[in-house]
Curated annotation (Swiss-Prot):
This is Large ribosomal subunit protein uL16. Keywords: Ribonucleoprotein, Ribosomal protein, RNA-binding, rRNA-binding, tRNA-binding. SUPFAM superfamilies: Ribosomal protein L16p/L10e. One of its GO terms (molecular function) is rRNA binding. One of its GO terms (cellular component) is cytosolic large ribosomal subunit. It comes from Photorhabdus laumondii subsp. laumondii (strain DSM 15139 / CIP 105565 / TT01) (Photorhabdus luminescens subsp. laumondii). Belongs to the universal ribosomal protein uL16 family. InterPro entries: Ribosomal_uL16 (IPR047873), Ribosomal_uL16_bact-type (IPR000114), Ribosomal_uL16_CS (IPR020798), Ribosomal_uL16_dom (IPR016180), Ribosomal_uL16_sf (IPR036920).
Length: 136
């Protein structure tokens, strides 16, 4: 699963997830899966969606993952009282704003790409839409 090789600090503040996304255009492939809603994707969810797409296109074409989980989420163990410091890092997430292109695909017909993205979207907790590259 995806996670940073090394970070400057082990733990991070919760922070806020406001604004609109950078990276709102399909830039590598021909088709893309764009976030409509706001939320966060865990490394497991990103990987599950990638696997679903890869199986759907039967390993033809190419897939780009445009998001990376770079925020550590901590949790305290079960039945531990409050206080006594921040919990341990349990998983990594990517913060997603509306408009962010999550995945891109190339080298497959549009119908197959739509089907693959539909399967991938079912694995994700945020609302998404299918987009194509616009040629200027």
């Amino acid at each position: 699963m995806l996670q940073p090789k090394r970070t400057k600090f082990r733990k991070m503040h919760k922070g806020r997830n406001r604004g609109l996304a950078a990276g709102a255009d399909v830039s590598f492939g021909t088709f893309g899966l764009k976030a409509v809603g706001r939320g966060r994707l865990t490394a497991r969810q990103i990987e599950a969606a990638r696997r679903a797409m890869t199986r759907a296109i039967k390993r033809q074409g190419k897939i780009w993952i445009r998001v990376f989980p770079d925020k550590p989420i901590t949790e305290k163990p079960l039945e531990v009282r409050m206080g006594k410091g921040k919990g341990n890092v349990e998983y990594w997430v990517a913060l997603i704003q509306p408009g962010k292109v999550l995945y891109e695909m190339d080298g497959v017909p549009e119908e197959l790409a739509r089907e693959a993205f539909k399967l991938a979207a079912a694995k994700l907790p945020i609302k998404t839409t299918f987009v194509t590259k616009t040629v200027m």
